[in-house]
Amino acid sequence: MSQHCDDLMTFLNESSSPFHAVSALAARLQKAGFTQIKQLDDVVLSPGSGYFVTANDSSIIAFRAGHGQPTDGLRIIGAHTDSPNLSVKPNPVKKRSGVVQLAVDVYGGALLNPWFDRDLSLAGRVSFVDQSGQLASRLIDFRRPIAIIPSLAIHLDRDANKNRSINPQTDILPILAGLSEDDATDFDLSVLLANQISSEYEDCSDVRVLDFELSLYDCQDASLVGLDNSFLASARLDNLLSCHAGLQALLAASDAYWSLLVCNDHEEVGSASSVGAQGPMLTDVLEFIAGSAAASRKLRDQSTMLSVDNAHAVHPNFSDRHDESHGPILNRGPVVKINRNQRYATSGEGSALMRLLAERTGVPLQHFVVRTDLGCGSTIGPITAAETGIRTIDLGLPTLAMHSIRELAGCADVEYLDRLLTAFYNRVA
């Protein structure tokens, strides 16, 4: 197993929610000597040092202070911390047919069929009043199977394999617990969450839960797949794979240059939030680095960004869903994503830069253009380019089953991407 895939799988298993992903990224940054900034104005940057800032516990920006002037330009890599999931509603508990169920919302464009018959757990952030009467929040993760969404037996729906649609309001409520016939005790989710907080945090006993941001996830760990272990199967490859690759590149980057990694939340639902790509987080940090609004404009004019998000690999059973000349293949290298209608931010000059960078790095490079008769997804790339004016290139790793509960990528591609992003930071081209 390559070290690249090994560490990525560890990160994926740790990152059961965007909150946990940012926590895992921050821990790796601190271990590497990066300093967390609480208030931007209170810090004097030291050349060669690393810094990071978080927002809402679900977005993070990390950067290296180079030895040159930041107004000469930064190399920026952007990714996102969120993935499609089933999010627990505020008043979710339902008791019927002898079981306790949770009502859920669909977050983002989730592929729903694969969520059935999986061992599911629960993770996220819980807000509560502590013993001193203060409002506080903590991350929790049950890290064991506590829920499941059983399929309807084919005997009760003979057309299931031909024509079964899913109603997200009624069909995907997970079972959480059983109820005995004479059970008069109300199931209390707040008590369950309070007990989980107490079990994870010694200083948080006897808390009163007020609210939560929780989502379900598949308990199965990331794993290598194939006779030759050439594939990686996991939840949340879109887009934690890119967050991890950006982090690895930043840690390996030369401190001679200014380099920055931004991992935003809320990409899967449009990025229009205070911590999404459409929010002020990146522009605020860039102005802090530059020292003034005027200097920030010069910095942004001289900077280049890679928006790194997964690309659709050709599915061998559905190869007609791709343009025949622009179909990425697993383990054949990262993918430059192009859309002339600006669903991706890549220009001809940006694509040329990536071709030269890949050539000098010895990394194979592929290109993706969606079929002309199909709609095209988007990324944080066009949004960040529009908000900042920074030249942006959309890049990604070929992936199958995108937005499923479990996605598939190539192990060789993971190493290719790490090398390419490190070379980007180091100005190889």
Residue ranges and their predicted role:
Residues 1-429:
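N-terminal hydrophobic/helix-forming segments and targeting peptides
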